[in-house]
Amino acid sequence: MPPSTELDALVDKIVNDHSLSEPGQSLKELGDNGKYIMDVQMKKLLKLHDQSFIERCFTPMEELKNRYAKVKERSGDLQKEAELVDRDIRIIEMAIQDINKNKSHQ
């Protein structure tokens, strides 16, 4: 049996040893890989996803909005024109009624 000082020295060596065992090395590599994935690859993936979302969803919707905003403006003009036509028809109808009244009184 080793003397207690030798035993103490071995225990100190084991406890204070900072070199990694094979499982410790594997665990460190996994941690480093996880950090790389979160710091680098996840940012790239989010940027790619954002760009893909913009191209597939936002841009087509923006184009539709721009296209149909023009139609909406024209339909607003159509509403005004319809109101003017309706007013003109009422004036014509009233004029016809007045003409018919004048004919019947003569």
UniProtKB/Swiss-Prot annotation:
Principal cellular location given in the protein's record: other
Source organism, top-level taxon: Eukaryota
Keywords: Endosome, Transport
Compartments (UniProt record): Endosome
GO aspect biological process, one term: endosome organization
UniProt keyword Transport present: yes
Record has Hydrolase as a keyword: no
Cleavable signal peptide: none
Gene Ontology cellular-component annotations: BLOC-1 complex; endosome
Summary of subunit composition and partner proteins: Component of the biogenesis of lysosome-related organelles complex-1 (BLOC-1).
Record-stated family: Belongs to the BLOC1S1 family.
Role according to the record: Component of the biogenesis of lysosome-related organelles complex-1 (BLOC-1), a complex involved in endosomal cargo sorting.
Protein name: Biogenesis of lysosome-related organelles complex 1 subunit BLS1
Lineage, highest ranks first: Eukaryota, Fungi, Dikarya, Ascomycota, Saccharomycotina
